[in-house]
Amino acid sequence: MKKPNGTNGASSSLEPPPSTFQPLCHPLVEEVSKEVDGYFLQHWNFPNEKARKKFVAAGFSRVTCLYFPKALDDRIHFACRLLTVLFLIDDLLEYMSFEEGSAYNEKLIPISRGDVLPDRSIPVEYIIYDLWESMRAHDREMADEILEPVFLFMRAQTDRTRARPMGLGGYLEYRERDVGKELLAALMRFSMGLKLSPSELQRVREIDANCSKHLSVVNDIYSYEKELYTSKTAHSEGGILCTSVQILAQEADVTAEAAKRVLFVMCREWELRHQLLVARLSAEGLETPGLAAYVEGLEYQMSGNELWSQTTLRYSVVVD
């Protein structure tokens, strides 16, 4: 088995600029990872043992515990299960056309709502159905608030925008949907039991958008080699290369490695902007205790996403 340079989506020579953000992980990470991984190993149709090992090595529950380190102990497993199944579906979509992927996701939407019963012989259907039913049983109001953000994310995954030429600004706007920022925000609120009013959420829209850029670009930096490999081996539509690394490299006429270094500096600027926007919110007397917890949660999403992206084997490229 050959493992080329650039595993974890970035060459070993890439040294990120220092960050003032410090990641935090949920204290139940080991327990919940074992529980959730065990569930999917039992129920998901992995094609072979190699795929099962790759799934465990990706650490989907770990990234969820880094995203939501202050989730309530009795809710973190819901978040882990939801992000895990969405990651697994995302992998399947790479080998489908946009039309096939859209049909696949659209079939899951009414099942998620509970409007249609699942086919119990199809794991993805009953996993999705059972998960949403259990989340609604725990907190129907907050679970229902996650539905539309999840559907927005699922539809962005198969949006033909991915195949169109985009500048960096247009790309970041698209990725706000594709990276699932609204989904992550709603799932964070659910996992923390954090109820915010529409007016409170309106006050942090700019902070949300800023966080989305950071999440998207950090993922792009570390997943570039994996995405490049996928673009050559997966479906021509589902596996299309759509990344800020490629866009900046082409627009600025620099190498992919140079583009990564520039993008990392931008990420640090977005961190500074996050701090400035949060300080302004407080100075204007608009920060409630709920919003203070929310914007702190966004900071943990950014730092946690970066730590996971640096270390996950999901972004490794392994060639047999």
Swiss-Prot record:
The pathway entry for this protein reads as:
Sesquiterpene biosynthesis; aristolochene biosynthesis; aristolochene from farnesyl diphosphate: step 1/1
> Which residues make up the binding site for Mg(2+) 1?
D90
Cofactor section = Mg(2+)
Binding-site residues for (2E,6E)-farnesyl diphosphate, renumbered to this chain = R314, Y315
- Give UniProt keywords alphabetically: Lyase, Magnesium, Metal-binding
Show the segment(s) annotated as Disordered. 1-20
Q: Which residues bind Mg(2+) 2?
A: D90
Polar residues composition bias: residue spans: 1-14
A GO BP term here is: isoprenoid biosynthetic process
- From which domain of life does this come? Eukaryota
Q: What is its EC number?
A: 4.2.3.9
Q: Which Gene3D superfamilies match?
A: Farnesyl Diphosphate Synthase
Matches recorded under InterPro entries:
Isoprenoid_synthase_dom_sf, Terpene_cyclase-like_2
Q: Which residues form the signal peptide?
A: none
Coiled coil: which residue ranges? none
- Please convey what the UniProt record notes about how activity depends on pH: Optimum pH is 8.0.
Which GO-annotated molecular functions does the record name? Answer: aristolochene synthase activity; metal ion binding
Q: List the disulfide bonds.
A: none
Provide the family line. Answer: Belongs to the terpene synthase family.
PANTHER family the UniProt entry points to:
BETA-PINACENE SYNTHASE-RELATED (PTHR35201:SF4), TERPENE SYNTHASE (PTHR35201)
Oligomeric and partner information: Homodimer.
What exactly does this protein do? Catalyzes the cyclization of trans,trans-farnesyl diphosphate (FPP) to the bicyclic sesquiterpene aristolochene. Produces germacrene A as an enzyme-bound intermediate that is not released by the enzyme, but is further cyclized to produce aristolochene. Aristolochene is the likely parent compound for a number of sesquiterpenoid toxins produced by filamentous fungi.
Q: What name does UniProt use for this protein?
A: Aristolochene synthase
Give the organism the record lists: Aspergillus terreus
